[in-house]
A protein has these predicted regions:
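Alpha-helical transmembrane segments and their helix-helix packing motifs
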Residues: 1-244
Length: 244
């Protein structure tokens, strides 16, 4: 008996409809639920950032291996966000699909973005504290701590223009990853689909504002307890977080 198999992925028009429906759901979500889910997303991205810095602590790796494999390590964060249904500020940029179709208002959109941004920040800071208390930075002869400071110092050395445009490029790739995730019909589809866009933006050195909610405080904390190079203070932190 012949069986009509479903296509490998959703068609672009179906993805658009799915993105609009997701935007409506996010815009009408109660504050408490949205904030908690955003905290989870911030924590998940921080987990990806932690995986990335642990990998980078191996000084024997070539530059190319660090960028590409490190990018794949960072993918953990967005995989967890998409599969677990958490609320990520950068991915929620696709809510403009629902706004442009008139299904949500500007006030709903902005309220959601502000709520999720704050929740992401809180979640990332919680992971910073947990990583410190767990002593993860002491791994590999404390090379992980040096890696954490090095990543943060590299980000704070950029000028404002470079940060801004790297932030735009990063979110293009993040939205493409989320779009591909919407296209997938299974968990495997979603995971495989998002790997390359996320690994690519990490390898290219683009700037992800939620990831920096982890990288910069973690690097600053490591410097404060005596590791690595100088990491600039609160003004630089705010400059990096404002890049979106």
């Amino acid at each position: 008996m012949a069986v009509n198999a479903a296509p490998d992925c959703l068609a672009p028009a179906e993805i658009e409809a799915k993105a609009e429906a997701a935007g409506v759901t996010k815009a009408t979500m109660p504050f408490g639920k949205a904030f908690v889910l955003a905290m989870f997303a911030g924590a998940f991205i921080a987990f990806g950032g932690l995986f990335f810095t642990v990998f980078l602590s191996d000084a024997s790796l070539t530059w190319g291996a660090q960028r590409v494999v490190g990018g794949l390590c960072f993918c953990l964060g967005l995989v967890l966000v998409l599969v677990c249904g958490a609320e990520l500020f950068t991915g929620n940029s696709l809510m403009v699909c629902a706004r442009n179709s008139g299904k949500i208002s500007w006030s709903q959109l902005l309220r959601s973005w502000v709520t999720v941004w704050l929740g992401n920040f809180v979640g990332a800071i919680v992971v910073v504290l947990l990583v410190y208390l767990a002593g993860i930075y002491k791994l590999n002869g404390e090379a992980v701590a040096t890696s954490m400071v090095s990543v943060a110092a590299g980000k704070t050395s950029l000028d404002a223009g470079a940060i801004f445009f790297r932030g735009i490029l990063c979110n293009v790739f993040v939205c493409l990853a989320v779009w591909i995730g919407f296209a997938g019909r299974t968990v495997v589809d979603k995971v495989v689909g998002i790997l390359l866009p996320i690994a690519a933006f990490v390898a290219c050195g683009f700037e992800h504002c939620v990831a920096n909610m982890y990288f910069l405080p973690m690097g600053a904390l490591m410097h404060a307890v005596g590791y690595g190079a100088d990491v600039a203070g609160a003004q630089t932190l705010l400059k990096n977080e404002s890049k979106y």
